[in-house]
């Protein structure tokens, strides 16, 4: 394209089903993700409607099945996003992504609150060469939404999928097969249907209030660090005996802090990073099995930061009685105290609403701050 164009849109490809190719009988729905490059995907999608004053700058960041997404992939993606956002000629970004972890990347970009420029993510539920592939239409919709956001000077992170626009902070994959695979609330009340027409403009989603009680790390800090702190997720569930997973984490943490006896415990420490944070996906409105009490206390005594949230996707927006962040300085009777503690800060309510995997990202970023 003509390099004299002053307005650019960056398109970053990362693989996923939208880049997948079918294997075997089409009716079985089997495919390999991340096989097709972003240039070919864009050519196939016939991106009609790209306005003449926009130039597309296309880059292949990675070609993976998004279930295999790593921190290293995120680091590369963040570096490319940073480069694009620092370029005054770039007006917006589109990222193609596998749906399995799309919500995590969307949350990461939204939580970092990088820029006033719009970022749109999209993907597909059917492979690139499937007869019923939805990727091309999702791409066309995403490009139209991105251009509308640019023209209305609206920033933020959004996911465009199956004719709807979702705020990056709240979006969640809720269906493993349907083309309409995402939601952003119990009644999808945070989603916006795309209504094409001369006067249509995207809704200006209100971003989450910036009440996270700790400083979010600067993007440069994240990129310079390279590695992220290890943060795991454990779930409270029926039949939990002795907090078995937690107990294993305790034994591992002990061995890392005192490696000499580790051989006796049968703990292999090679290549293992010490646990720094733990997200507990509690039941209901953020409750937990009593059997988790002692191992949680021991992990906290060894310096692990513990965050409580709920495994239930919706309905705990107004959690009562559960401060979210628990530091190792908390008293031993913290679990009993939690039940007596009224919700007295906006901070607790906001972080309570985070689903476990998003809470994990927020906690990891906090530990880097």
Region annotations inferred by a language model:
Residues 1-84, 314, 333-341:
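ATP/NTP phosphate-donor binding region
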Residues 75-88, 249-252, 267-269:
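Short, well-structured alpha-helical segments in soluble
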Residues 95-117, 288-297:
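Short Gly/Thr/Asp-enriched flexible loops that form oxyanion-binding sites at enzyme active sites
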Residues 24-35, 101, 107-119, 135-141, ...:
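A glycine- and small-aliphatic-rich helix-loop capping segment at beta-alpha/alpha-beta transitions
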Residues 265-268, 282-369:
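C-terminal non-catalytic interaction/assembly regions of soluble proteins
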Residues 121-200:
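Internal gly/pro-rich beta-alpha loop/helix module
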Residues 90, 115-118, 301-306:
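A short helix->loop->beta-strand "cap" motif at the edges of active sites that frequently abuts
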Residues 6-8, 12, 24, 37-50, ...:
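Accessory alpha-helical/coil subdomains and C-terminal extensions
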């Amino acid at each position: 394209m003509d390099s004299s164009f002053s307005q650019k849109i960056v398109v970053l490809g990362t693989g996923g089903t939208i880049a997948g190719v079918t294997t075997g009988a089409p009716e079985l729905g089997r495919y390999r993700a991340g096989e097709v490059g972003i240039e070919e995907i864009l050519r196939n999608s016939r991106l009609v409607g790209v306005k003449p004053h926009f130039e597309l700058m296309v880059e292949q960041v990675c070609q993976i099945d998004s279930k295999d997404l790593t921190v290293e992939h995120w680091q590369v993606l963040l570096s490319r996003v940073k480069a694009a956002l620092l370029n005054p000629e770039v007006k917006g970004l589109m990222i193609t992504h596998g749906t399995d972890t799309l919500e995590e990347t969307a949350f990461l970009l939204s939580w970092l609150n990088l820029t006033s420029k719009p970022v749109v993510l999209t993907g597909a539920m059917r492979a690139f060469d499937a007869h019923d592939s939805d990727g091309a239409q999702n791409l066309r919709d995403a490009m139209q939404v991105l251009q509308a956001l640019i023209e209305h000077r609206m920033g933020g992170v959004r996911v465009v999928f199956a004719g709807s626009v979702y705020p990056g902070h709240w979006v969640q994959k809720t269906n493993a097969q349907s083309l309409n695979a995402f939601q952003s609330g119990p009644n999808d009340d945070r989603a916006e249907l795309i209504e094409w027409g001369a006067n249509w403009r995207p809704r200006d989603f209100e971003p989450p209030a910036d009440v996270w009680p700790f400083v979010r790390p600067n993007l440069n800090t994240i990129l310079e660090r390279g590695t992220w702190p290890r943060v795991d997720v454990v779930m409270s569930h029926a039949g939990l005996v002795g907090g078995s997973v937690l107990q294993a984490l305790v034994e591992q943490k002990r061995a890392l802090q005192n490696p000499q006896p580790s051989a006796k415990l049968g703990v292999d420490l090679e290549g293992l990073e010490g646990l720094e944070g733990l997200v507990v996906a509690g039941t209901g409105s953020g409750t937990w099995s009593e059997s988790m009490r002692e191992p949680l206390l021991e992990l906290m005594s060894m310096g692990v930061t513990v965050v409580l949230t709920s495994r239930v996707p919706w309905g705990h927006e107004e959690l009562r009685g559960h401060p979210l962040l628990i530091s190792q300085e908390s008293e031993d009777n913290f679990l009993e105290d939690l039940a007596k503690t009224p919700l007295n800060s906006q901070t607790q309510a906001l972080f309570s609403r985070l689903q476990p995997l998003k809470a994990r990202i927020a906690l990891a970023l906090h530990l880097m701050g």
